[in-house]
């Protein structure tokens, strides 16, 4: 069996884009470790915080619950502050993850990679999939940490821009899908995202297409753990099983050192 370390930016990032891969790896008996870079302090603030409870407190509880759903063997928080989206005032906070010294942050992650004798680590693609500053920092720190630790396999999570476009065009022919996905037809995967680049990567550079339909129920359960960010009325939780599988039943990775196009492969082949 192998050890997989999943490095994410915020509590809840573990769910949608890599959750099926995590669930599958755990179910197959691999050791799976979650490392979260930031405290998620700049997410949605729920109305039901207890006296003295902060959003950071709540999100720490939520990610711990999600980790149990997925079967993580270990959860580590690096303790950096959430940087917020591009242009937010929080970007200038000295404690924000985007302002961390890459070498220092990478040493923290590398320590975990070494402790775990990690066979593989997941991070994000070069622009954080959709340009979020903290996601881009995960890429930079993750790449350096893997180099320091000698982790042999690096998988960069991404969105298949071409597959998303095909799904959108198909969905537009089905009113039920349009309704359940809250206007998917209005989303243009080729439009500039938070950093000015389109979301994800083209199919031609993606190495791994992972079918995780079998684990979509676990993904939903883990998403539901993050109640401060995703309410009962969220379309994520109210999609029919078939449409959820259509939208989130496949996950995509670029394995460093390998090329596309995307094809059906498992991380531990």
Give residue ranges: language-model regions.
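Metal-dependent de-N-acetylase/amidase catalytic core
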Residues: 1-5, 90-91, 95, 99-269
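Active-site rim/loop-helix segments in enzyme catalytic domains that contact anionic ligands
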Residues: 1-117, 144, 148, 254
């Amino acid at each position: 069996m192998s050890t997989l370390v999943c490095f994410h930016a915020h509590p809840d990032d573990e769910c949608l884009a890599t959750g099926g891969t995590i669930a599958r790896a755990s179910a197959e008996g691999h050791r799976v470790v979650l490392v979260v870079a930031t405290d998620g302090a700049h997410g949605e603030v729920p109305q039901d915080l207890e006296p003295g409870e902060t959003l950071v407190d709540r999100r720490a509880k939520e990610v711990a619950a999600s980790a149990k759903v997925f079967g993580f063997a270990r959860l580590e928080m690096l303790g950096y502050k959430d940087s917020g989206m591009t242009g937010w005032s929080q970007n200038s906070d000295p404690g924000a993850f985007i302002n961390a010294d890459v070498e220092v942050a990478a040493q923290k992650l590398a320590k975990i990679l070494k402790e775990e004798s990690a066979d593989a680590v997941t991070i994000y693609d070069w622009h954080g999939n959709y340009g979020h500053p903290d996601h881009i920092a995960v890429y930079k720190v993750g790449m350096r940490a893997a180099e320091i630790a000698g982790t042999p396999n690096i998988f960069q999570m991404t969105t298949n821009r071409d597959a998303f476009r095909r799904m959108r065009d198909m969905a537009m022919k089905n009113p039920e899908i349009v309704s359940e996905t809250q206007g998917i037809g209005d989303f243009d995967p080729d439009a500039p995202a938070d950093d000015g680049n389109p979301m994800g990567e083209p199919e031609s550079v993606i190495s791994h297409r992972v079918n995780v339909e079998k684990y979509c129920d676990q993904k939903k359960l883990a998403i539901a753990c993050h109640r401060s960010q995703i309410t009962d009325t969220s379309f994520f939780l109210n999609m029919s099983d078939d449409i959820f599988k259509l939208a989130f039943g496949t996950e995509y990775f670029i394995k460093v050192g390998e090329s596309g196009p995307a094809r059906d492969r498992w991380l531990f082949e």
